[in-house]
Amino acid sequence: MVKYTEDRLLELKEETYIPQPQILEAFNQMIESVKEHAAAEAEKHKAIKWNNGDTYIDEHGNERPYHHMNRRRASRTANKPSLRKKSVENVDEDGWATLSKPKRSFGADEGLEERAKFRESVREGTVGGSGTVKAKPNNKNLGSSKAVDPRDAIADKHTTTFNAFEALGDGDDDDDDE
């Protein structure tokens, strides 16, 4: 692709030839009419909208109505802070930029010593007698008369399974053993 400087483009502008200037003029007029129509539609929509005529000029110089300032209920989305950490861009000596992912939790570095101490004590067996963590059952539910879940009862029932190797080993059916 050929690249031109700004000066070269200005020189070429004078030398260019538009074969049909009436088509270009009609196209420009059509664009202007579309812009005018869009502005008229926006003005019509603005007039239809509820408005008591009481407006003010905001910091950007736009005329705005007051109805957005005194709502009955506060906006739910405006008060939520964005708690996601931004990814940090690291540039190495070669000029490559990599984005490092932020850590998931905000207090990731806070409990490292206690966590390591607890894991070490579990490995050594100081928490429980034989290296396991002992847990007390919830005694209030042990003697309840609550019905047993039927899915657990079905899981405990012994079922006969089909053994394919046994079926291949026998040449005859099981009914002929009598």
Swiss-Prot record:
The keyword Cytoplasm applies. The keyword NADP does not apply. Residues 61-155 are annotated as: Disordered. Residues 113-123 have a biased composition (Basic and acidic residues). GO terms for molecular function: eukaryotic initiation factor 4E binding; translation initiation factor activity. Keywords: Cytoplasm, Initiation factor, Phosphoprotein, Protein biosynthesis, Protein synthesis inhibitor, Translation regulation. One of its GO terms (biological process) is negative regulation of translation. InterPro entries: Caf20. GO terms for cellular component: cytoplasm. It is found in: Cytoplasm. Its main location: cytoplasm. Belongs to the CAF20 family. Acts as an inhibitor of cap-dependent translation. Competes with eIF4G1 and EAP1 for binding to eIF4E and interferes with the formation of the eIF4F complex, inhibiting translation and stabilizing mRNA. This is Cap-associated protein CAF20. It comes from Scheffersomyces stipitis (strain ATCC 58785 / CBS 6054 / NBRC 10063 / NRRL Y-11545). The lineage of its organism: Eukaryota, Fungi, Dikarya, Ascomycota, Saccharomycotina. The gene is CAF20.
